[in-house]
Curated annotation (Swiss-Prot):
Catalytic reactions of this protein: a UDP-3-O-[(3R)-3-hydroxyacyl]-alpha-D-glucosamine + a (3R)-hydroxyacyl-[ACP] = a UDP-2-N,3-O-bis[(3R)-3-hydroxyacyl]-alpha-D-glucosamine + holo-[ACP] + H(+)
Gene Ontology biological-process annotations: lipid A biosynthetic process
Function as written in the Swiss-Prot or TrEMBL entry: Catalyzes the N-acylation of UDP-3-O-acylglucosamine using 3-hydroxyacyl-ACP as the acyl donor. Is involved in the biosynthesis of lipid A, a phosphorylated glycolipid that anchors the lipopolysaccharide to the outer membrane of the cell.
Active site residues of this protein: 244 (proton acceptor)
Family per record: Belongs to the transferase hexapeptide repeat family. LpxD subfamily.
Record's protein name: UDP-3-O-acylglucosamine N-acyltransferase
Record keywords: Acyltransferase, Lipid A biosynthesis, Lipid biosynthesis, Lipid metabolism, Repeat, Transferase
InterPro entries membership: Hexapep, LpxD, Trimer_LpxA-like_sf, UDP_GlcNAc_AcTrfase_non-rep
Quaternary structure, from the entry: Homotrimer.
Organism: Leptospira biflexa serovar Patoc (strain Patoc 1 / ATCC 23582 / Paris)
Pathway the protein acts in: Bacterial outer membrane biogenesis; LPS lipid A biosynthesis
GO MF entries: N-acyltransferase activity
């Protein structure tokens, strides 16, 4: 494993404040780990005030902290930063550098002569690349990837094993896809006539922006007539489905096992929790948040946090809904009490 010095951290984090760290200049730090598991050669981090006591007891030699926890840990060797989690991510990358391409190409590939492969791009075993496709510079195409005709993949892409890019799919720079995801398969379009389901040709494309990351086993379908589009900076968890004609804005996050039905439009910075179902032709405005397990059948009217099943309720509305649901179990008891009161005051109870 890579080991790093204090001086490397100081170079990486020029805006950070290093406190009580002078005695650590000769230490070879061997990793970054949790407060409870850290040893004398480790770095750890304090995500919030909740973990201050754990931090005080930790054996880590150096802690990444925020300004709000720095005073409570002033006797420790600390790095004071504005964003603890972001800094932690940068430090982890020091210990675990990303795999870099070297331009190696397996002999067991099938690449059409008309395809263009950029410089310093790795191509693994059993990769196929179709006619007139363009692969950018500094990409890593892992084993078993299937790339159709006229596909474009931008510079710096990382394509996991057995991913499939159907004809005419376009993805931007620094695209990441983990294994077994598919892009540009036919949308689910059929018309029932003459006693059977007749397929509607799906002739649109999938067009994906820059800096998008897609987990394993995701499916993004081509549009029927227009393109399915994914904006810049989007991050999809495993097993996310995007149906035909969807328009996804920039920096959208979708957690695992969630699906967008056809022609859904998501604004920028939308967050969709896990196991959500978004019905067709809905629109979510910029910044909308859908809580995990929700199912939407109507478009939310404003930017808010929505939660529920076929309800489209804001979070405060859902809290009231939950209270009412709990009260239903007492309904028969309350009805009996009302009947008894009516008898006492001489009101005849009428059956409806």
């Amino acid at each position: 494993m890579t080991q790093i010095k204090l001086s490397t951290l100081q170079t990486l984090l020029p805006d950070a404040t290093f406190q009580n760290s002078e005695t650590l200049k000769d230490i070879n730090f061997s990793g970054l780990t949790s407060l409870t598991l850290a040893g004398p050669s480790d770095i750890s981090f304090v995500a919030s005030k909740t973990f201050v006591n754990e931090a005080k007891a930790s054996k880590a030699s150096l802690l990444v902290v925020s300004q709000e926890t720095a005073e409570a840990l002033s006797d420790k060797a600390i790095i004071i930063v504005s964003k603890v989690e972001l800094t932690t991510a940068k430090i982890i990358r020091l210990f675990f550098p990303e795999k870099q391409p070297s331009g190696k190409r397996s002999a067991q590939v099938a690449i059409d002569p008309s395809a263009k492969i950029g410089s310093n791009t790795d191509i693994g075993h059993f990769v196929t690349i179709g006619k007139d496709s363009i692969i950018g510079n500094d990409c890593i195409i892992e084993d078993g990837v299937k790339i159709g005709d006229r596909v474009q993949i931008g510079d710096g892409a990382r394509i996991g094993k057995n991913c499939v890019f159907f004809d005419d799919t376009i993805v931007g720079k620094r695209f990441i896809a983990f294994g077994n995801s598919t892009f540009g398969g036919d949308g689910f379009g059929f018309v029932y006539a003459e006693g059977k389901h007749n397929k509607i040709p799906q002739v649109g494309r999938v067009v994906i922006g820059d800096d998008v990351e897609v987990g394993s086993n995701c499916t993004i379908d081509r549009g029927a007539l227009t393109d399915t589009t994914i904006g810049n900076g989007c991050k999809f968890d495993n097993m996310v489905h995007v149906a035909h004609n969807c328009k996804v804005g920039d920096h959208v996050i979708i957690a695992g096992q969630s699906g967008l039905a056809g022609s859904v439009t998501l604004g920028n910075n939308v967050i969709i929790g896990g196991a959500c179902a978004i019905s067709d032709h809905l629109t979510l405005v910029d910044g909308t948040i859908i809580a995990g397990g929700s199912s939407l059948r109507t478009s939310p009217k404003t930017k808010d946090v929505y939660v529920g099943w076929d309800l489209g309720l804001t979070f405060p509305e859902f809290q009231k809904y939950r209270v009412n649901i709990k009260n239903i179990v007492n309904l028969n008891k309350w009805l009996k009490r009302i009947e008894n009161i009516e008898k006492k005051v001489g009101i005849e109870t009428k059956e409806s």
